[in-house]
Curated annotation (Swiss-Prot):
Residues annotated as domain HMA: 2-68
Name of one Pfam family that matches: HMA
Superkingdom of the source species: Bacteria
Binding site for Cu cation: 13, 16
One cellular component (GO) term of this entry: cytoplasm
Stated role: Chaperone that serves for the intracellular sequestration and transport of Cu(+). Delivers Cu(+) to the copper-exporting P-type ATPase A (CopA).
Keyword Chaperone recorded: yes
Gene designation: copZ
Keyword Amino-acid biosynthesis: no
Protein name (database record): Copper chaperone CopZ
Disulfide bridge partners, by residue number: none
Lineage of source species: Bacteria, Bacillati, Bacillota, Bacilli, Bacillales
One GO MF term: copper ion binding
Induction entry: Induced by copper and, to some extent, by ferric and lead ions.
Length: 68
């Protein structure tokens, strides 16, 4: 199991948090995703044999947010 902290711009409310967490949790191999709105970060626990960080970034960007 691996952990990645992603910096995400544009998240400001509960809907943003829900959208990003849901998008990540729907990826096979992601076991948990936790958005911290105060610091604009997402902590993701995942199985690196099933999912790549680039897939997680794409899922976040598909929701309209920028991964920096």
């Amino acid at each position: 199991m691996s952990q990645e902290i992603l910096n995400v711009e544009g998240m400001s409310c509960g809907h943003c948090k829900s959208a990003v967490e849901s998008a990540l949790n729907n990826i096979d191999g992601v076991t948990s995703a936790d958005v911290n709105l105060e610091n604009g970060q997402v902590s993701v626990q995942y199985d690196d044999s099933k999912v790549a960080v680039s897939q997680m970034k794409d899922a976040i960007e598909d929701q309209g947010y920028d991964v920096v």
